[in-house]
């Protein structure tokens, strides 16, 4: 089916408005190129660092900021390293190929340079990082980024970092509890570029409290001028665990036209500047019910994002709050994936007492044997 016919079908049979039909079609075509490289022996690894310097008021992720919990980081890394050893050993025993590694959080660069060296060094011991399609360090908060940390990341083979401002309006940043300024972001972005790490992602959020079309479009224009390889545009979403729900009931002030104008602006301007949409997903309770879209320069797609969202291969996760997703996407299943999940304890204290990794490894092996993948 041609691209034109796909868009026409989405519009006529599924009542998708033309601009969204075009967006969905463009994303699908880009994802097809990536998904087409996957087979049943491929997998990725997610490494959870669930600590942050402060907690954003809209955040509902597993992340901890108190000094008492931050003091757990040294012990956490030792426990995490042991779990990674067992997980990678199982991956090797099963004959799987690791395509991507993603270190997320939380804020992974809350680790010191020495702690980061310990973690990245351990991963380098366990897998050939030079053979990875992509190796991401989700740095996130600009106020945790230093040249020394990114030098360590580059030394150990990291190919993609995330430097996430969310907004370049200081009033908006202050209002959502971010402990950095727009200048801090610009400094961190320069550090990332000078590090020689080839791919930089920046996250932005449409519809943050106190934001407007004027301030958001200014933010987006400034980001475009920096030419990051990836720009991920999220629509503001508040979940039950978010602090902002206790602060104000008026959190969807951009429910109407401004949010839509901001979303449309990102899609128009990104295209004009040579970016293409490569992945997309929806969440509940977003401002204006809009989508989250990842844009990239040609050839700079964030491959882990596609593998994870489209559930085309297994992702083995280690760390507090981490969830492994084992996937069999073989033709004999009629095109429908068989998916099983394995959960680590949510809280760092519980994780440090957890001894279930051996059970998870056996579950991994049982899944692949049951699906006749080994």
Which role fits each region the language model picked out?
Residues 1-42:
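Flexible, acidic/Gly-rich N-terminal and inter-domain linker regions that tether
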Residues 1-6, 238, 249-374:
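Auxiliary Fe-S-binding modules of radical SAM enzymes
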Residues 37-41, 50, 95, 129:
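Short, flexible hinge/linker loops that cap or flank conserved catalytic cores
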Residues 40-75:
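Canonical Radical SAM [4Fe-4S] cluster-binding loop centered on the CxxxCxxC motif
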Residues 42-44, 160, 303-305:
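Broad gene-expression machinery/nucleic-acid interaction feature
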Residues 48, 162, 231-235, 306, ...:
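Beta-strand scaffold of nucleotide-dependent catalytic cores
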Residues 48-50, 203, 281:
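Conserved acidic functional residues
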Residues 63-266:
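Conserved non-cysteine loop/helix-boundary elements of the Radical SAM core domain that shape
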């Amino acid at each position: 089916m041609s691209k034109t016919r796909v868009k026409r079908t989405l519009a006529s049979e599924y009542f998708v408005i033309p601009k969204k039909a075009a967006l969905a079609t463009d994303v699908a075509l880009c994802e097809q190129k990536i998904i087409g490289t996957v087979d049943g022996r491929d997998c990725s690894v997610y490494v959870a660092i669930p600590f942050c310097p402060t907690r954003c008021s809209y955040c509902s992720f597993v992340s901890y900021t108190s000094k008492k919990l931050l003091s757990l980081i040294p012990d956490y890394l030792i426990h995490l390293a042991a779990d990674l050893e067992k997980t990678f050993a199982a991956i090797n025993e099963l004959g799987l190929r690791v395509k991507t590694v993603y270190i997320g959080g939380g804020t992974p660069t809350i680790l010191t340079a020495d702690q980061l060296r310990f973690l990245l060094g351990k991963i380098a011991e366990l897998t050939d990082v030079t053979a990875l399609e992509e190796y991401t360090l989700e740095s996130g908060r600009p106020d945790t980024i230093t040249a020394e940390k990114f030098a360590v990341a580059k030394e150990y083979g990291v190919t993609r970092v995330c430097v996430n401002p969310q907004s370049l309006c200081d009033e908006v940043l202050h209002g959502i509890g971010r402990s950095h300024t727009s200048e801090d972001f610009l400094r961190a972005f320069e550090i990332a570029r000078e590090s020689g790490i080839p791919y930089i992602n920046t996250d932005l959020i449409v519809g943050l409290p106190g934001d407007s079309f004027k301030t958001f479009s200014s933010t987006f224009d400034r980001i475009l001028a920096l030419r990051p390889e990836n720009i991920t545009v999220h629509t503001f979403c508040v979940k039950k665990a978010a602090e902002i729900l206790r602060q104000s009931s008026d959190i969807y002030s951009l429910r109407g036209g401004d949010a839509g104008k901001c979303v449309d602006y990102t899609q128009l301007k990104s295209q004009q500047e040579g970016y293409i949409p490569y992945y997309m997903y929806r969440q509940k309770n977003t401002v204006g019910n809009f989508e989250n879209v990842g844009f990239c320069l040609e050839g700079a797609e964030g491959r882990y994002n596609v593998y994870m969202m489209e559930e085309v291969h297994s992702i083995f996760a280690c760390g507090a709050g981490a969830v492994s997703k084992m996937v069999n996407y073989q033709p004999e299943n009629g095109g429908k994936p068989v998916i099983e999940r394995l959960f680590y304890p949510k809280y760092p204290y519980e994780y440090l007492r957890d001894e279930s990794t051996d059970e998870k490894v056996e579950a991994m092996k049982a899944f692949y044997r049951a699906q006749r993948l080994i």
